[in-house]
Amino acid sequence: AVAEAQTEADSSYENSLNIAGDGMMGIVEIPKIDIKLPIYHGTSDEVLQKAAGHLEGSSLPIGGESTHAVISAHRGLPSASLFTDLDQLEIGDHFLIHVLDETLCYEVDQILVVDPEDTSALAVEDGEDLVTLLTCTPYGVNTQRLMVRGHRVPYEEQAVADEQTPLSGLSLHTNYLLWVVVGIVITGVFILILFIREKKLQKKAAKQKESEE
């Protein structure tokens, strides 16, 4: 009986917001870092390899008083950026949840770095409409969790669109790629210098040999 009840509960969750029948609940959009990801049920590896996942047990991402939805995604996958640049968000920035033909706007009001087992910041707060974006940190190490929380505000399309500007700073991921490119260029230049120097030494040695003969 318990197993049957659990199966029914799982089935009920999987069908929640599954309007198109493809498992997609909605879309999370973060204008500042130019990210728009589908949100699927759960946070399995299969989901997080391709999209954002809704943390089962948290509120459904449909807004409303006394709700707190949690949306999770990976950072720095070779195949997709996902939440790689989530660390670029600051207090006052906005992100959007597109669900059921509605656009819900959230303003960032809290940014935390916590241990994986610390979920206290994900609790529902009475009367509040909250969404937390969750990912691993530091980049490439992933020993902690970055939580970017927002509270519901009226959606002002132009104000949010204005946040789509070049990033004021480079993320760890972007910095890493930049240093890789710089390293390759420097190595290439160094090899070229050695090659030219070797050629000059060979020519000099050849001339000396000719003069001796």
List PLM regions with ranges.
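Solvent-exposed, non-transmembrane regions of membrane-associated and secreted proteins
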Residues: 1-176, 201-207
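Short, hydrophobic alpha-helical membrane anchors of single-pass surface/secreted proteins
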Residues: 176-182
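Alpha-helical transmembrane segments
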Residues: 185-199
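Solvent-exposed, low-complexity, intrinsically disordered
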Residues: 210-213
